């Protein structure tokens, strides 16, 4: 998992990462009681603003639209019907962007909303337009805030009875963030969730340890993946898939706990916080 001494130059390697994709999971944005974690939200926005002021480019992939829609509607349980899920997404997405706009405006940063479906990656013309738009936004010093367009997408909202092996370009924001990184030619993927990283089993079980570094995503590593949470769609398996996409493209990925204050600063300093995934080849 972690060859001796391999982490010694991690800080030096990460210092050279100038374009980052940061993915915020629903359980980072939302509290356990289903309300918005505003303090944590604004803290992460401040960290991103510092990265921008230090000359780094940031693309932010943000979950949370459905969770925010559920909050607005007073729902405690995730809806089972597709139309209800999409209604939650429509309500929550505007709320999500309003919070981002308020936070980043106070910090002197400009943002843009980018909503994607799998067709944006399948269709060559739409894909070319997407790449051009992201490049233009970054060139203007704008932070693209990217989310799957849940209101119109029909293949990625998991519902009871869904076939487990449906062919998808992406089915969650974890994998989407990996695809965004490769197509935007970014250097580092930061997956922020409510867990400390990849564990060698159930984190609550005795003797289970946090894995600080992974140099190859083997079947053993995949076996450590846990299930999904209640509000979001992603789990450890989808994060490993995102890490696989990124590392096979020659980039770094890290899974870290977005509840930890200043975790982004620690990640960008190359600290061994969370679980780091090393590139399989040179970028």
Question: Which ranges hold each PLM region?
Answer:
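C-terminal catalytic "cap/lid" subdomain
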Residues: 2-78, 82-110, 114-283
């Amino acid at each position: 998992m972690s060859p001796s001494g391999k982490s010694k130059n991690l800080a030096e390697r990460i210092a050279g990462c100038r374009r980052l994709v940061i993915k915020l999971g629903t359980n980072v944005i939302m509290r356990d009681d289903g309300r918005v974690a505003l303090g944590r939200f604004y803290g992460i926005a401040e960290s991103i603003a510092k990265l921008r002021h230090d000359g780094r480019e940031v693309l932010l992939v943000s979950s949370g639209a459905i969770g925010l829609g559920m909050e607005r509607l007073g729902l405690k349980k995730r809806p089972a019907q597709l139309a209800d899920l999409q209604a939650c997404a429509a309500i929550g997405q505007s709320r999500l962007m309003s919070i981002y706009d308020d936070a980043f405006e106070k910090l002197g940063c400009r943002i843009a909303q980018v909503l994607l479906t799998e067709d944006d990656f399948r269709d060559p013309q739409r894909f070319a337009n997407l790449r051009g738009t992201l490049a233009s936004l970054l060139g203007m010093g704008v932070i693209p805030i990217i989310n799957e367009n849940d209101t119109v997408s029909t293949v990625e909202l998991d519902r009871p009875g869904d076939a487990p092996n449906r062919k998808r370009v992406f089915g969650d924001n974890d994998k989407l963030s990996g695809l965004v990184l490769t197509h935007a030619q970014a250097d580092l993927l930061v997956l922020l969730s409510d867990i400390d990283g990849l564990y060698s089993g159930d984190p609550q079980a005795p003797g289970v340890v946090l894995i600080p570094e992974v140099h190859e995503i083997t079947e053993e590593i995949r076996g450590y993946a846990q299930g999904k949470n209640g509000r979001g769609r992603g789990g450890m398996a989808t994060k490993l898939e995102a890490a696989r996409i990124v590392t096979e493209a020659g980039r770094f990925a890290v899974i870290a706990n977005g509840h930890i204050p200043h975790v982004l600063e620690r990640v960008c300093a190359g600290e061994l916080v969370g679980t780091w995934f090393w590139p399989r080849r040179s970028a």
